[in-house]
């Protein structure tokens, strides 16, 4: 689960390295976000000469969380880190590559482009 002030790893090749959640979208009182939810992030660390700069504000989708995800068949899946992929205005991924595994729940959240860019879907 991700809430405001949570630091996340940026898992794409846009140039951002570390981002901070500044808003969870989907209701005025919404506190937590899970895999497949859209959040607003501020880039805290970035690679020099990249399209994404430190201090930029973007929308992002969460692709991994440290908090376990319960599936319908009773299994649980959890990852080592909290990670996101930066999105453009049309909610398409801004980068051309996604690093690391992504959760299968992104397929249910209609982020097929992110799923197809990922090397591994768990």
UniProtKB/Swiss-Prot annotation:
GO terms for cellular component: cytosolic large ribosomal subunit. GO terms for biological process: translation. PROSITE patterns: RIBOSOMAL_L14. Pfam families: Ribosomal_L14. InterPro entries: Ribosomal_uL14 (IPR000218), Ribosomal_uL14_bac-type (IPR005745), Ribosomal_uL14_CS (IPR019972), Ribosomal_uL14_sf (IPR036853). GO terms for molecular function: large ribosomal subunit rRNA binding; structural constituent of ribosome. CDD domains: Ribosomal_uL14. Keywords: Ribonucleoprotein, Ribosomal protein, RNA-binding, rRNA-binding. Part of the 50S ribosomal subunit. Forms a cluster with proteins L3 and L19. In the 70S ribosome, L14 and L19 interact and together make contacts with the 16S rRNA in bridges B5 and B8. PANTHER family: 50S/60S RIBOSOMAL PROTEIN L14/L23 (PTHR11761), LARGE RIBOSOMAL SUBUNIT PROTEIN UL14M (PTHR11761:SF3). Belongs to the universal ribosomal protein uL14 family. Binds to 23S rRNA. Forms part of two intersubunit bridges in the 70S ribosome. This is Large ribosomal subunit protein uL14. It comes from Borrelia duttonii (strain Ly). The gene is rplN.
């Amino acid at each position: 689960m991700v809430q405001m002030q949570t630091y996340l790893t940026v898992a794409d090749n846009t140039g951002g390295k570390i981002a901070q959640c500044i808003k969870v979208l989907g209701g005025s009182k919404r506190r937590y976000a899970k895999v497949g939810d859209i959040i607003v992030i501020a880039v805290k660390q970035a690679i020099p000469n990249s399209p994404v700069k430190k201090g930029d504000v973007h929308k992002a989708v969460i692709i991994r969380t440290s908090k376990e995800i319960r599936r319908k068949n009773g299994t649980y899946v959890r990852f080592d880190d909290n990670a996101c992929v930066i999105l453009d205005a049309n909610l398409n991924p801004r980068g051309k590559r996604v690093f690391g595994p992504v959760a299968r729940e992104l397929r249910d959240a209609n982020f097929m482009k992110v799923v197809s860019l990922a090397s591994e879907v768990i």
